């Protein structure tokens, strides 16, 4: 899980999810794409 100031979808499998006021990118196809805004 990378922590970034700006998160972007990196492939078509990436999903944008909001949890506890934070924006997360979750990707089941390529877990390297997982990101959270911090």
From Swiss-Prot:
The keyword Ribonucleoprotein applies. InterPro entries: Ribosomal_bL36 (IPR000473), Ribosomal_bL36_sp (IPR035977). Keywords: Ribonucleoprotein, Ribosomal protein. Disulfide bonds: none annotated. GO terms for biological process: translation. It holds the Pfam family Ribosomal_L36. One of its GO terms (molecular function) is structural constituent of ribosome. It comes from the Bacteria. GO terms for cellular component: cytoplasm; ribonucleoprotein complex; ribosome. Belongs to the bacterial ribosomal protein bL36 family. This is Large ribosomal subunit protein bL36. It comes from Pseudothermotoga lettingae (strain ATCC BAA-301 / DSM 14385 / NBRC 107922 / TMO) (Thermotoga lettingae). The lineage of its organism: Bacteria, Thermotogati, Thermotogota, Thermotogae, Thermotogales. The gene is rpmJ.
